């Protein structure tokens, strides 16, 4: 068993959780064999632990629709053992370790039961920006279906994504109300050259700031800065 509690990174999809995870990984948190898709999640945990659970309870493995019902979440046996075994096999020795998955909040009770001392990072983004991103992203297609729109009581794809964002936000409130050790971070602030939240988050996690972080994230923020016509001064 791993004595060190994990860092669990979540947020509504299209919110920038992958960028935050990349920073935390660069600053020393072990993540195992990171996602081939550049999303800074762990593929083995996703595909062999989380996805089967979602399939078993009959919800969407992409975390779009249908979603788990919080009050009806079942706690599977051996969750902690399965997750830690992946990390150990993939080379974990000691120190901070992390797992990033936007769907963590949809099943927070499972993870909280397995890792009650985990530190949670909730990555946020403005609702309108999330919805715009969903509408532009090919695999975000749950609410192109009129059947799904009708099921959640809306009549357009945009309204469907608004409903969906609210579902995630309700889970965030539940997590905080439950007393879980959560820190909220808004990556958009970095677009304007404000890195204070990421500094504070790393300090809270007990990880050192590395100057290479700026070289990692600035190119990721470039397109957003161009659209917003933001000039930063380092």
Set out the residue ranges of the language-model regions:
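PAPS-dependent sulfotransferase catalytic domain
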Residues: 87-88, 92-210
């Amino acid at each position: 068993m791993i004595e060190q509690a994990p860092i669990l990174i979540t947020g509504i999809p299209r919110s920038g959780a992958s960028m935050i995870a990349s920073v935390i990984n660069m600053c020393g948190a072990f993540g195992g064999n990171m996602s081939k898709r550049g999303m800074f999640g762990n593929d083995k945990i996703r595909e062999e632990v989380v996805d089967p659970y979602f399939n078993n309870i009959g919800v969407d493995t992409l975390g779009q629709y249908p979603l788990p019902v919080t009050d009806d979440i079942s706690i599977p046996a051996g969750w902690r053992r399965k997750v830690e075994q992946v990390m150990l096999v993939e080379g974990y020795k000691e120190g901070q370790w992390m797992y990033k998955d936007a769907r963590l909040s949809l099943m927070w009770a499972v993870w909280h039961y397995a890792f009650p001392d985990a530190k949670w990072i909730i990555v946020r983004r403005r609702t309108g920006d999330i919805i715009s991103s969903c509408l532009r992203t090919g695999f975000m297609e749950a609410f192109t279906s009129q059947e799904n729109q009708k099921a959640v009581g809306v009549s357009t794809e945009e309204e469907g994504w608004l409903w969906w964002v609210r579902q995630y936000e309700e889970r965030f409130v539940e997590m905080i109300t439950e007393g879980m050790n959560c820190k909220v971070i808004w990556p958009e602030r970095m677009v304007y050259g404000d890195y204070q939240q990421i500094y504070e988050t790393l300090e809270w996690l007990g990880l050192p700031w590395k100057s290479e972080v700026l070289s990692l994230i600035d190119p990721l923020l470039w397109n957003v800065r161009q659209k917003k016509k933001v000039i930063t001064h380092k």
